[in-house]
Amino acid sequence: MITEAIQKVVAGINLSEAEAMETMQEVMEGKATQAQIASLLTALHLKGETVPEITGFARTMRTKVIRVQTKRRNLVDTCGTGGDGANTFNISTACAFVLAGAGLPVAKHGNRSVSSKCGSADVLEQLGVFVQLTPEEAGLCLDQVGIAFLFAPLLHGAMKYAAAPRKEIGIRTVFNILGPLTNPAFAENQVLGVYSSDLAPVLAQVLANLGTKRSFVIHGCGGLDEISLAGEALVYEVKDNQVKEMIIDPMDYGLDRAPISALAGGDAKRNARMIKNILSGAPGPQRDTIIINAALGLIAGGLVRDLAMGIRLAEQIIDEGYALKKLNLLVEFSQTLVGRRSAAL
């Protein structure tokens, strides 16, 4: 199938969802050569990936992921595509602790740095979290703490076949956008930031196709994959298989304008310090950015009806120490799990 798929895509012909599923299956079962994988990814990039293609790829990837089992329901994920090149601090990771502090179960899917200086796994490690949990440990962490980090390389083993071609061609590929669509705990609700305004409605429709419960796809001012205080954000709400476009301006909710430079991050040590400060109640544009992005997650998880209520609740969760407490609990429990491993040896 992959040979036929390459020929079609090179000719500018879109794949059907079924064809995309079959093609990805060959890739993830090691039946495609590295040259074929590289050719397919490059051709797709040049043609532009469609909703049926991304949906089909994601469906196959979901069948290959090592599933994280949990007793928790109504899971939320804040994993975005990354790749905006802005080198901000880890906004979606900080938001995850606000959501968990509010009582939402958070299955935070992520990886090490791809396009920035510091990925979610990097900053969580710096904060003291043990990120390389087994599927069983991650499920236990979700059950006991209400938040767990799902480290992509340990749970998407079939991705190994595409790793070398992706690295060698050195361009952004469809795999960069498949990560947020393939949460190993099958989170039903998402806040998914994207690096391109053109990609936002595409991924919103893909989420609808995949049966998301309630999710938001965000493309922020200045190309950010988050809502920023610099200006209006393009947001797509996905609910009941319907996609609704909206524009969100933080100023409409009493938040002051701030340049994107106010969100500048650095290495893992710097970003960890910034997150700790925000969760400890430090005021400023970094806090306000976390609050408005977390507010969307609170809506997605069903805790609040609208953005204004979400902002108020996010402020309360931070100011009353619940978000920081959740971070500390995750650090403690993840390290306890490591200790159990050592004791079992």
Swiss-Prot record:
Domain of life: Bacteria
Pfam families xref list: Glycos_trans_3N, Glycos_transf_3
Residues where anthranilate 1 binds: 80, 111
Binding site for Mg(2+) 1: 92, 226
Cofactor note: Binds 2 magnesium ions per monomer.
Pathway: Amino-acid biosynthesis; L-tryptophan biosynthesis; L-tryptophan from chorismate: step 2/5
Enzyme Commission designation: 2.4.2.18
GO cellular component, one term: cytosol
Cofactor(s) listed: Mg(2+)
Protein name, per record: Anthranilate phosphoribosyltransferase
Function: Catalyzes the transfer of the phosphoribosyl group of 5-phosphorylribose-1-pyrophosphate (PRPP) to anthranilate to yield N-(5'-phosphoribosyl)-anthranilate (PRA).
An example Gene Ontology biological process: L-tryptophan biosynthetic process
Gene (UniProt): trpD
UniProt subunit comment: Homodimer.
Origin species: Desulforamulus reducens (strain ATCC BAA-1160 / DSM 100696 / MI-1)
Binding locations of Mg(2+) 2: 225-226
